[in-house]
Design a protein with these regions (language model features):
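Nucleotide/phosphate-binding catalytic cleft detector across ATP-hydrolyzing
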Residues: 1-9, 13-200, 219-220, 229, ...
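Extended, folded domain segments that form the structural surfaces/walls around functional sites
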Residues: 4, 191, 203, 296, ...
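Short, solvent-exposed amphipathic alpha-helical segments in soluble enzyme
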Residues: 18, 195, 333-339
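Short, charged, surface-exposed secondary-structure boundary motifs
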Residues: 40, 189, 234-235, 351-356
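Glycine-rich phosphate-binding loop of actin/hexokinase-like ATP-binding domains
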Residues: 197-239
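Glycine-rich phosphate-binding/hydrolytic loop that grips phosphoryl groups
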Residues: 346-396
Length: 410
């Protein structure tokens, strides 16, 4: 079982692993996130979020059958303060000295300690090993001089994790199995070993966009940008004088399509105002709004990529996923803005043919990625036989109490 707690939507998914290589997705339930309850991936109003999640889990359990009880759930962590921080540590190596695993573990702990106290370290990955200014493949091969290790330290504000734990703890009879780094699990889901020689996975969410960079087969960097599809919708509401429903509908139907194409059509005809006034929206203005915000998002994505690698070293380019990718010509527009090749990623090959169809949609890549990484079981099965024996046991105990009550009159 996995849950996504996003700015715009809450979603839960149930799946069974097949040979540890694919997922049989059994059911998906989703609904809009209660308004202003999650901001930039951080739970702000846990009571409302818990109530909505509990309702979704009940629906999910009903789909799985009366005998199935959901006891645990995995959650993807995707807050805007989630990122990797590069940290370098070094130590001297005496001539003839062999580095042990314990010595390397000490270096990793030193890297962890370099982050501020308000940050929670989620994971530490060695990116490069250098000895006497030369890159080495294996640190154990260093037998003298010095060793410098650069780590990618995955971290997030500690209160983000605390709020997530508090939220899940309020779910009745359902514990947190684990929280996983969503940008990383999604990126690993959508890439091949060849892709990871040089690529960036960009996940366009509603409130946040994540970017995960792989170079030379290893994860080099990831970050979450607090901008996403909701911001395009908000711009259309403001500049087009539209309702939220109108703005979201136009964005999904025409946003990227009209941003890229010349069309003889000059205006969108909107529903009349309450006083009968005719309402229209210039397609030129519509295009400018969509492209301006998307350009801003892609610009920040490219800045994060530049932190660790020149964009011309991304041999596999940008791999896109998330809600915005459902719009026509998304990859073409993004490639034009970024100056790097781009394509829409797919996780359908990880799913069995009998999985529910919606699970293959890009907006569910995060949930599928989290489930692929989860290892423990999340349900218990109650047999009818056990339920009957439990009922008989209760009746038996009631009988004993009744016997005790009347024993004094014997």
């Amino acid at each position: 079982m996995a849950a996504e707690i996003g700015n715009a939507k809450l979603a839960v998914m149930a799946a069974r692993k097949v040979d540890d290589k694919r997922l049989h997705v059994l059911a998906v339930e989703t609904e809009p996130t209660p308004k202003n309850c999650v901001r930039n991936g951080v739970v702000c109003k846990p009571t409302e979020v818990v109530a909505a999640l509990n309702g979704l889990l009940k629906k999910l359990a009903n789909r799985l059958g009366a005998s199935v009880v959901i006891t645990k759930i995995y959650v993807g962590l995707n807050a805007h303060t989630l990122r990797t921080t590069p940290v370098s540590v070094s130590r001297s190596v005496f001539d003839g000295e062999r580095l042990t695993d314990d010595m390397l573990a000490d270096l990793e702990q030193e890297a962890r300690r370099q982050l501020p106290a308000e940050k929670q370290v989620l994971e530490v990955s060695a990116v490069t090993y250098m000895s006497n200014d030369n890159v080495v493949a294996q640190p154990h091969d260093v037998t003298g001089g010095s060793l410098q290790v650069t780590y990618a330290v995955a971290n997030v504000d500690a209160d983000v994790v605390d709020k997530l734990k508090q939220c899940v703890a309020q779910l009745p009879a359902c514990a947190l199995a684990d929280y996983l780094i969503a940008p990383k699990t999604t990126a690993e889901l959508l890439t091949t070993p060849d892709d990871r020689q040089g690529c960036a996975v960009v996940d366009f969410g509603a409130g946040c966009t994540s970017v995960t960079v792989f170079v030379d087969g290893a994860l080099k960097h990831f970050a979450v940008i607090p901008l996403g599809g909701q911001h395009i919708t908000a711009d259309l509401i403001t500049f087009g004088n539209l309702s939220e429903y109108e703005a979201e509908s136009l964005k999904r139907q025409f946003g990227i399509k009209y941003a890229d194409e010349n069309t003889a059509k000059k205006y969108f005809q909107m529903a009349d105002a309450s006083d009968g006034t005719k309402r229209t929206l210039s397609i030129d203005d519509f295009k400018k709004v969509c492209v301006a915000r998307l350009t801003e998002i892609v610009k920040y994505v490219m800045e994060q990529i530049a932190v660790c690698v020149p964009s011309d070293q991304l041999s596999a380019g940008l791999i896109l996923t998330g809600g915005l990718t459902t719009m026509d010509n998304c990859a073409k527009i993004v490639a034009g803005i970024a100056g790097v090749s781009a394509r829409i990623g797919s996780h359908a090959h990880w799913l069995t043919p009998d999985s529910v169809k919606q699970a293959s949609h890009n907006e569910y890549a995060q949930l599928v990625g989290v489930l692929m990484q989860g290892n423990g079981g999340c349900v218990e099965t109650q047999s009818k036989k056990k339920k009957r024996s439990g009922f008989k046991e209760i009746i038996g105990k009631m009988g004993e109490k009744m016997e005790d009550m009347f024993s004094e009159y014997k």
